[in-house]
Amino acid sequence: MKKLLSFLSAALCLYAVAPAQHRADVVRPSDPAASSMILLGDPQGYVKYDINQPIFDLVTRWIADNVENLNINAVLCTGDLVEQNDNNALNRDMLNQTSRQMWEAVSSSFSIIDGVVPHLHSPGNHDYGFKHAEDEHTFFPDYFTAERQGEVILKHLVAEYPNREGRASLENAAFEFSLDGWKKILIITSEFAPSDGAVEWAKSLCISEKFKDHIVIYMTHSYMRCHKCDNSIIPQERYPLTQKEGNNSGEQLWAKLFSKVPNIRLVICGHHAHAGEIIDGKMVVCDTLSSICENKTLEDRFFDIYLDYTNGNGGEV
């Protein structure tokens, strides 16, 4: 026994002092000077079943592990963080978690990258109301505060606009990034079906003297239909919240904001899968997370990413 213990002690000591091995799974950009951002589609499929929640932990752990390798500057999430915002009665045909359990699970997954890389969110219809965006109530600002991420996000946060409950929230917020080889970038997040006030705030921000020369990325949960619906811009959502005057669906966002502001160069949305279209000569395409958009420029790309409804698409980012 003493010999065995001595052998194990020696082995552990050798392991402790041995140089780190080169990992076979390290991903690096082809250009060492390149920068990246991670786009996460709607994660509700990960959190509505407890058995799927560890998959989303793997997603955020992979991000944390590759921040330096890929020079990741931010993580952008298109919302629908939970399946239902505020419900305790379980419909076991579609979930086995209460709303509180889902909010705590998705918050826990993102806590893995708190203080490591900023994560920005545009909440979706599932993040509001009782079950189906019946009203403007959301638990998002209770779980996703600026303080939880600390300086890693506060140094980028340059403006915000109150949500529909009148609360300070990162639902409507603007973040400034400086990447090597790029103009300065302004990323604007939005609440689901943003209010007229939030839309006007974003417009004023984009054309202001301070940000008029920035490349603007606007992220909103809902903007386009899927390819089965001809990739059209959503004319009007059918949720009670979106029926209220002053809340804007896709066509209203195009008319009031995207078509009016030239430095909005990229719009990111979730909600539907496989969207792609050309609008007034502006490129609007990306079929799946792994799609390659050919013969297109960066100008006015509209990406629509949606993870598999049942299990979150196995952890792809």
Give short role names for the model-derived ranges:
Residues Y46-K48, E83-D86, P123-H132, L170-A173, ...:
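Active-site environment of divalent metal-dependent phosphoester hydrolases
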Residues A20-Q97:
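N-terminal active-site segment of His-dependent metallophosphoesterases
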Residues P32, R92-S99, G197-E200, E209-R265:
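Active-site-proximal segments of metal-dependent phosphoesterases and phosphodiesterases across multiple
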Residues L39-G41, N73-D80, G115-G124, S190, ...:
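Active-site neighborhood of phospho(di)ester-bond hydrolases with catalytic His/Asp-centered motifs
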Residues N87-W201, K210-F211, M283-D308:
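Extended active-site neighborhood of metal-dependent phosphoesterases/phosphodiesterases
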Residues K244-V317:
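Conserved beta-sheet core of the metallophosphoesterase superfamily
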Residues M1-H22:
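Bacterial Sec-dependent N-terminal signal peptides
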Residues A34, N71-I72, V116, K183-I185, ...:
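A general structural motif
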